[in-house]
Amino acid sequence: MNKKILKLGILTVAGAAIVAMKKSKKEKLVYSYPQTKVKKSDYKNTELNKQKKNSKGIYYSSGNYEAFARPKKPKDIEKKSAYLVGSGLASLAAACFLIRDAQMSGDHIHILEASNIAGGACDGVADPDRGYIMRGGREMEDHFECLWDLFHSIPSLEHPENSVLDEFYWLNKEDPNYSLCRATNHRGKPSENFGKFNIDAKGRKQIMKLFFTANEKLYDKTIEDVFDEHVFDSDFWLYWQTMFAFENWHSALELKLYLQRFIHHIGGLPDFSALKFTRYNQYESLILPMVEYLKQNGVIFHFHTQVTNVIFSFENDQKIAKSIEYIKNNETKILPLTKDDLVFVTNGSCTESTLYGDHHTPANGDAQIRTAGCWNLWKNIAKQDPSFGHPEKFCENVSKTRWESATITTSNTKIIDAIKRICKRDPLSGKVVTGGIISCEDSNWLLSWTINRQGQFREQKEDEICIWVYSLFCATPGNYIHKPMKDCTGEEITAEWLYHIGIPLDEIDELARDHANTVPTMLPYITAFFMPRTAGDRPDVIPDGCVNFAFLGQFAETPRDTIFTTEYSVRTAMEAVYGLLGVDRGVPEVWGSVYDVRNLLDASVRLMDGESLLGADLPMPVEKLKGWILKLIKDTDIEKLLKEYKLIKK
C-alpha cells in the first residue's frame, strides 16, 4: 500500500505540473513570485568575474582549461617560508602544491613531524617485531579531482619517467576492480542478495528526504534521527555502513553529503566496481613518492618535533600567527614568525593514540588513550578564537569514535583455499582478490575483511598474503571467541575470522595459533570526524581574517566534499596553499554528479533494484495519468533519456 501511495504521489505531482503548464498557456495565470527590482537598462548578460576569488582567496573550476593551465609565480614568493605541522597526506600535498603551483623554493618549506616517519594515517609498516601492519585502507574513484591533479605531477619511484597517476591508471585499466562476493553468512556462504539493496518504499522515502534536506536542518542530528528500521534492516545499509564505517549515532549531515557526493556510484556500491586501489599499501604507493619528490626539491623534514601550540596576535580584524611552540629532544622551544612565514596545521587525527597488540597481546589498554599530540594542539589553538573550531565535539567520546582493525599474515594453503572458495580468485595472482571488503553479515562484531593485490608490501614473500580485518562492534562478544574484539589477541581475532570464512571447527585453533601472525590495532578516534556537528565546529581551511595560517585535513571545513577520503585531505591542502599565496588557478570543484539529471535518474532506478515508477504497472486511474504523461513526452529528448536510464520500458 505504501509503495502505491508513493507512486501515486509522485505521478500526481508530475501530472499537476503538466496541467498547470498547459493551463498557463491558455489563461496567462499570474503568480505571486517575488520579483527582483532590476531595470531592463541595468541588466546585462556577461561572464565577467566568473573566476573572481572568494573571501578565502580561491575560486572553483571544472574542465580541462583550468586543469592543464600552469599559474604564474605569486608575487614576492621568494620572501616567504612555510611551516607544515604534521606529515600526513594533507601536509605533504600542501608542500607539493607550494613547490609546483606557488613555485616556492623547497628549502623554504619545513615539515614538522612528531614521529619518526611521514605518512600519517596512510601507513603500511613491516614491523620487525610485530609483523606487517596496515591500520586501514584507501578506496579511490575517478572523480577525486584534486588527488589526481596532484599525482599527475609526482614521479613514480620505480619508473620516474611516469607519474604516480600514470601507473595507477594503467593498473586499474588492466586489472579493473570488482567484487564477486560482497557479503557472507552461515560461516562463509555467499549472501543470496548480492547486487541488490532490498530497501522498501518507506526506506527509499527516508533516503530521498535526507538527500534533499538543507544542511542547516541536519546540524547535530544523528543518522538515527532520520532513518529507522526500514533503512537499517536493508542490504543497502549493510553495504553502506561497512564500506564507509558509518554507525547509527554518526552525523546525518555527513551521510547526506556522502549520498550527494557519490550519487554517481550508487550502482557500483554492491560489487565495488566503482572503486580503484593502489598496487601496494598506501605508504609505499602514495606517501613514499611524495616524500621523494619533496626531498628532491630541497624540502626540510624535522622529525621528532612535536608542535604544541601556535600563538596568534589579533590586530584590526587580522589573525596573525606569531610563533610556534614545540618540543624537540625534551626541550620546549619557540619559533618566531612574521607575516611572510606561513603556517599549515593538520588539526585532529583519526589515528592519534593508536594502540598496538600482537599475536599474543590484545590492543586494548583503554587507560592509555589520550587526546595528546594533534588533538591537544588543536585545543590550544581553538582557545584563542572561536573561528578555530571546537575539537571537543570530535574527540571526547571514544566509545563512539573507535573501532579495531587487524592485519593477518599467512601462507597456509588451507586458509588460502578457504579464501579462494569465497572470493573466487587466487590471492597469490598479484591481481585483484576480494575487490573490496567482504562483510560477515551475521557476525556479532560486524566483521569485514579484504585482500588487496598481493604482495601489499614490496618485501613480502611470494607465498604470503596479508588480510586486513576490521570490526565496527568491537565491544561485543564474538561468535566463536566469546570476547569483545578489543580484548582479543591477534590469535583470537584470527580464530574468529577463520570461523566466519568456514574453516572446520576442529582446525580453527591450530591454524590460528601456528599458521598465521596477526597484529591488532585499536584506533580510538578513527571515526571522530563522523560525530554530529554544527556550523563552526570544524574551522574553515582559512579562518576569516587569517593572514598567514590555514588548517588542513579531515577536520577542516570545505564545501560539499566528504571526509574519510584521500581527496578531502588533498583538497584542503590545495585550498590552503592557493588561498594564502594567491595562486591564480582554480581549485577543481567537487564532481557535480548531484546536479546531473542522468546520475539522478540512474540512481533512482538502482535504488529500487531495477524497478521504475514510470515503468511499473500501476492501478487505475494512476495508470491512465501515467499514460498521458508518456504520450506528452513521446518523440522528445526527455523520452529518450528516460528510456536510456530505464525509467520507462523501451
Label each region the model flagged.
Residues 4-82, 100-108, 607-650:
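Extreme N-terminal leader/targeting segments of oxidoreductases
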Residues 86-88:
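Glycine-rich Rossmann-fold phosphate-binding loop(s) that bind the pyrophosphate
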Residues 91:
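N-terminal Rossmann-fold NAD(P) dinucleotide-binding loop
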Residues 99-126:
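Glycine-rich FAD pyrophosphate-binding loop
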Residues 129-170:
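Conserved FAD-binding subdomain of flavin-dependent enzymes
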Residues 157-264, 276-277:
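Rossmann-like flavin
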Residues 260-342, 347-348, 360-361, 366-375:
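Helical element adjacent to the flavin cofactor pocket in flavoenzyme catalytic cores
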Residues 263-278, 340-342, 347-572, 578-595:
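C-terminal segments that line or cap access tunnels to active or ligand-binding sites in enzymes
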